[in-house]
Amino acid sequence: MSITPSKKSELISEYRIKEGDTGSAYVQCAILSERIRNLTEHLRIHKKDYHCRRGLMVLVCKRRKRLQYIKNKYGSDLYLDLVKKLGIRDVFH
């Protein structure tokens, strides 16, 4: 359910804005999206894992807040580009 360090570094290198960027909102959204995908797969198998389901909802809310921050700070174009890149729905447009 967690992300391996190699997968995390791969996501960081793919979504970073500049060299050495490991904590921008773009990178955080990418890491959160991967964690959400992992938990979703886990919940397909273990349908009654309510503790995990709550954790999933917390991660979804965190990602939504980060996406809203990106849209407000950087504009709709970069936000829509990130949403398309991550393969998630646009909830603010």
From Swiss-Prot:
Oligomer and partners: Part of the 30S ribosomal subunit. Forms a bridge to the 50S subunit in the 70S ribosome, contacting the 23S rRNA.
Protein name per its UniProtKB record: Small ribosomal subunit protein uS15
One GO process term, biological-process aspect: translation
Single GO molecular function: structural constituent of ribosome
KW RNA-binding (keyword) present: yes
Physiological role: One of the primary rRNA binding proteins, it binds directly to 16S rRNA where it helps nucleate assembly of the platform of the 30S subunit by binding and bridging several RNA helices of the 16S rRNA. Forms an intersubunit bridge (bridge B4) with the 23S rRNA of the 50S subunit in the ribosome.
HAMAP family assigned to the protein according to its UniProt record, in alphabetical order: Ribosomal_uS15_B (MF_01343_B)
Keywords assigned by UniProt, alphabetized: Ribonucleoprotein, Ribosomal protein, RNA-binding, rRNA-binding
Provenance organism: Anaplasma phagocytophilum (strain HZ)
Family: Belongs to the universal ribosomal protein uS15 family.
PANTHER family attached to this UniProt entry: RIBOSOMAL PROTEIN S15, BACTERIAL AND ORGANELLAR, SMALL RIBOSOMAL SUBUNIT PROTEIN US15M
